Amino acid sequence: MKKVIYTIVGFVFMWSTSVYADLTIQIDQSSDNAVPIALVPFEWKGAQLHPPQNITSIVGNDLLRSGKFKAVDEAKLPSRPKTLDDIDFYQWKQLGVDNLLMGRITEEANGTYQIEMRFVDLLRKEQVIGKRWSGISKSLLRQVAHKMSDLIYEELTGIRGAFNTRMAYVTVRNVKGKKQYSLEVADSDGYNSQPILRSSLPIMSPSWSPDGQHLAYVSFENGRSQIVLQSLDGKSRQIIAKFKGINGAPAWSPDGKKLALTLSKDGSADVYIMDMKTRKLRRLTRNWAIETEAVWAPNGHSLFFNSDRRGQPQIFQVFLDTGEMRRISYVGRYNANPAISPDGRYVAMVHANGGFHIAVLDLYNEDFNILTKTYLDESPTFSPNGEMILYAMNQGGQGKLAVVSVNSNVTQILSVQEGEVRSPSWGPYLPR
């Protein structure tokens, strides 16, 4: 392993609005089975010609990204109803659409906005969702649109939507011939990006706390790897692991009381657990091999990690109460970088099969499916509802992020205008 010694340290904490552009999204594939939904442009009552945000466009893109739904082309809408009484149900039936979204945006006297949504089941001829938000600032209009998407998704699937969530990732840019790393947080669609830390040295492996208030990540700011705990409000930042050798791969326990991490302070790279209150360590693996990238099962009773103890990287599970260990990946010679679905049923991993792709193992029936066709895929992370997987990939020699829906063939690619994106981590649910 090549040893790199850094002699120049430079890092900046950032809490203001991002000076960088948001991520841009490209829908690479679409699902033939996506259910059409009519999204009627919202009625606008305000001083300007158009509302500050196109709510239906945001909702439409959210639903398209799920792989389950698609918006009817606006030009094909037979009418633009504002109330339930305006709807000609026979007319919409001829279009083959079962659901319709309509609403209103009203500019309030103090410069904030009131947003109303009505979601209609055209078959039952009734409104199934009615919601109003008042006192909404311009900066929060996109968040309200994501909340609408969540409500619609849950109404139609029975599964809570995960559009009103955030993701953390690392960007790498060349600034005056030198690499600049930035740890950033953005909405699930790549908008509203905010830099958390900017450094001239690498930043890796961000991991969200279960309450969404902190990030643990790996920094090299003191010339060697160390694990940092940082609050998103900028009020606290602590170095919690700076042992000799490797300090890496932090992962929060489901209750937020512990952190799994990889350390080599005792020789080989092994998985440890740190009590976040006492900072005491428990060594979980003892092997000459490299044991790393541990993630917690949702019940907190076991961890999944990758190890090359059999000669090639494979995924193992270790139970905390007994120390029992078992191998779970058997398809192919290379499986690494595990991620666990929120219900504990699926393990996503990087699988080598003529390239590195994201695959999913069903722990219930042992079905193994390769989900992606992109290049040099790594770092899978599930959405909070388990319906989508965010991961890093390479396109044209540039690092980008991508999201694949678990049960369809829809892939979206997220990139920055300049530089690369890597090390994604999908955050927990935000308050409804």
Swiss-Prot record:
Subcellular location, principal: periplasm
Keyword Signal: yes
Subcellular location: Periplasm
GO cellular component, one term: periplasmic space
Bridged cysteine pairs (disulfide): none
Signal peptide positions on this chain: 1-21
InterPro entries: 6-blade_b-propeller_TolB-like, PD40, Tol-Pal_TolB, TolB_N
An individual GO BP term: cell division
Keyword Signal: yes
Pfam family, one: PD40
Record field: transmembrane: none
Keyword field: Cell cycle, Cell division, Periplasm, Signal
Function: Part of the Tol-Pal system, which plays a role in outer membrane invagination during cell division and is important for maintaining outer membrane integrity.
Family statement: Belongs to the TolB family.
Assembly description: The Tol-Pal system is composed of five core proteins: the inner membrane proteins TolA, TolQ and TolR, the periplasmic protein TolB and the outer membrane protein Pal. They form a network linking the inner and outer membranes and the peptidoglycan layer.
Protein name: Tol-Pal system protein TolB
Gene name per UniProt: tolB
